[in-house]
Amino acid sequence: AYEALDVLYPFNRYSEQAQLELIYCYYQDGDSPSAKVAAERFIHLYPNSVHSDYAYYMQAVSDMDQDRGWYLRYIPIDLSLRYPGTMRLGYHEFAELINRYPNSRYAPDARQRMVYLRNLFASYELHIADYYFRRKAYVAAANRANEIIHHYQGAPEVQKALVIMIK
């Protein structure tokens, strides 16, 4: 229905709200790629909208959730064991939201999600460093640990990375 409204009346006064509802509907339906595309479209069509912060937020959330897949709702899997993929893009989009709209109502949640993602990325890198260490590839393990220390300051895995470098 929202798509039809947009096709028939692309620039009427309800079009902007229909685009926002479409983003939400796609996301709630579990279609993160379509939610992201709809959010990007909204940002392109309405760059000065008072609701642009919501579109940036949903764009980032969609990227964060895109790698999870439907099966992770039913099977508990440690996400730090999987390649982060579009979660990295989501992290940068949360940062863009905070830079553009620091006083947005979505900024506090974006900051929390960035901390979660930073810790997830650090944990992923730590798993790789540990793998290299167990394989006796000490230089590769030290390089990964060094990357954790330099790129993920504040993450709990920094201390574990230091231990790998000391060994």
Predicted regions mapped to residue ranges:
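Acidic, polar-rich low-complexity tracts and alpha-helical solenoid repeat scaffolds
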Residues: 1-167
